[in-house]
Amino acid sequence: MDIQQGGNDLISLAATIRTELQQKLSSKARIHLPFDEDRTEFDKANLRFTQYERPTYLAIVDPVCEDDVIEAVKYARGKGIPFTPRGGHHSVTTTMGRFQNGICINMRPLNQMRWYAEKRHVTIGGGAITDEFVRFVHDLGMEVTFGAGLGRLQGKYGFLNDNMVSCKLVLADGSTVIASKDSHPDLFWALRGAGHNFGIALEATFQVYPQAHGGIHHTWDLEYTLDQCDEVFRTLNSVYESMPAELAIFILWLRQSSGRKHIILVNLVWSGPAAGADPYVQRFESLQPVLNSGRKSVPWPELPFSTYKEINKLFCNPEIWLRGPYKMMGAACVERFDLKTTREFFESVKSLSEEWEDRGWFSAMFECLPDQRVREISDDATAFPWRAGSNHFLMLNATPKRMEDRKVFEDHLNYWKRRFIETSGYGRLQQYVSYGNGTSTMKDPPEALYGYEPWRLEKLRNLKQKYDPDNVFRWYQPLLEP
């Protein structure tokens, strides 16, 4: 039953939640309900990158301090009401669709940041988003890997979670712990790769590093036709064999660009002195792109909004999200790009883009990131399972305008996900957890998200039993099925 369609029992329950929970929160904390006369704040917090297989909320809590989060957790547990935190509203994971008519704890107000110069540590609140964090760190003259845990600087610094120093967490019973290498080290291990199964992060502290080259990064966008696909990916495979820590490469499919249709865009980012990029840029320029942006040199915080034709300005704009509300994703990881599979995939995207031009969109983004520091760290150092097996991350995207057409779009994603797995070089799905379960019609097993080694899954499950025996945190990419 959907409260937004008028279920009387749910309306009554939502009103009760506000009455009872508001008394336990600080005076400036707010609770928003879907039937409020002025729905502005509820609608703002309810907005989401995709409406496909989305969760629904009886109430959305805006905390103003950590105690508000703790009280909301204790209240929900005591009443047997499901609850979930949320931050940047960007999840595409369909497992969240199981969460219906619960309490949403909007973490965005807890976006405070602190700097400890002596140790070069930055502490960020659980509601901070990427742009806020990156600008704060950049203004300090520092940097670290950032992205979805992965990032362009991982060849230098490892993953973002490799640089976590500690995390303050609300557990399922409402208690708080600080996990670090010296305090609850078992939980600290689990947080770095599977943390959403164990609690709500109130804040986390990270090691950061002095900026190289004044925090300036250099970027090139080069566009190719579908006829050039084999040459592009043959070159990419070759470059990756000796890819330096300063280089990161993204590949995108664009339905149209600069008056041309069906374009493969190669974005190169170089984090060292500009001249060092020349041998790699020249490899791609020698393929005769139909458009070459030339070099752009930008500060680190502007990089996401300067690369691949500034598309992130759309992805990060909530006002744009509802223009294509039903975003779906299929993802996989490959050791090398199989030329035949990759070309046939783009041919399929072109064909479907033409056939369904007025009824939806098809696209893709491939991430090819350096791994020097990533692989220097022991494979068992954190819960992240793919330190030695995660060369290229593939995100296949499809967005129908109407859910009546969903099957065509889901089938496309599922088919090509299977094809890429078959030719991945790994012989199985090795899935970055934030990219998993992008359609509701093809399930990623826990092993694909958390690792196939028996010891790794056993350790995680034992820790789950220790810290969340009732499987309260079971909505986002659950380690254990609800």
UniProtKB/Swiss-Prot annotation:
Pathways involved: Secondary metabolite biosynthesis
The EC number(s) this enzyme carries: 1.-.-.-
Keywords, sorted A to Z: FAD, Flavoprotein, Oxidoreductase
Enzyme's top EC category: oxidoreductase
Family: Belongs to the oxygen-dependent FAD-linked oxidoreductase family.
UniProt xrefs under PANTHER family: BINDING OXIDOREDUCTASE, PUTATIVE (AFU_ORTHOLOGUE AFUA_1G17690)-RELATED, FAD-BINDING PCMH-TYPE DOMAIN-CONTAINING PROTEIN-RELATED
Protein name as it appears in the record: FAD-linked oxidoreductase alt4
Species name: Alternaria solani
Classification lineage: Eukaryota, Fungi, Dikarya, Ascomycota, Pezizomycotina
Gene name tied to this protein: alt4
